[in-house]
Amino acid sequence: MKISFQKVLLNKRFPLKISRFVSSSCYNVFIKVEKDGIIGWGESAPAEKGAKTADEIITELEKLIKTNISNKSISEIEQISRELKISPCSYAGLDIALWDWKAKKANMPLHALLGLPIPKTKTSLTIGIMSPESVKERIPLLFHNSTAKYLKVKLGSPDGIDTDKLMYEQVLESSKKYNLGLRVDANGGWNTEEAKYMIEWL
């Protein structure tokens, strides 16, 4: 089994602002597993806990590969990963690639290989912290011709919960026509009292 990595710069369609920073791009790692003429693909994304960069992901996975995992089962590889304390965000991409390879080898969709029904998970899109005026523009751009049924709303503005409330009120108004389920993520932008208040308000 040959395992290789490719670090790829992914540019976001729109910069994403959360309570702690603004992100317009990121490096992810695409993982390729080759064996018997079949290729499995996976993707790992850095996380705040564990491997914080694409390079750290590659370093961790190279450490795992050096344990000679070629003839191990997926469950055995996962156990070795846990013993080596490989970050979940790093291992996830390799796990995906291994299962992708296994399903292709069996010439079956992965859900069928696992004995599961066709997945019916509804896609969610995310909107970052922004002004109500920007919300008016952004939501139609995101959901025009989209099959997504949920919108995750980033709150926790450095300008305070009154700013969050104005933004969220505009989200409610602008999302009506799309019949969306809404989720809120403040990313640690509220203290305990603010969180209690906003939970009630929302």
Tell where the protein language model's regions lie, with residue ranges.
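Conserved active-site and cofactor/substrate-binding residues in soluble primary-metabolism enzymes
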Residues: 25-26, 52, 72, 85, ...
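Short hydrophobic-acidic sequence motifs that mark active-site Asp/Glu residues
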Residues: 30, 36, 41, 150, ...
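Generic structural signal for residues positioned in beta-strands
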Residues: 2-4, 30, 122-124
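Metal-dependent enolase-superfamily TIM-barrel catalytic cores that perform enediolate-based chemistry
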Residues: 112-202
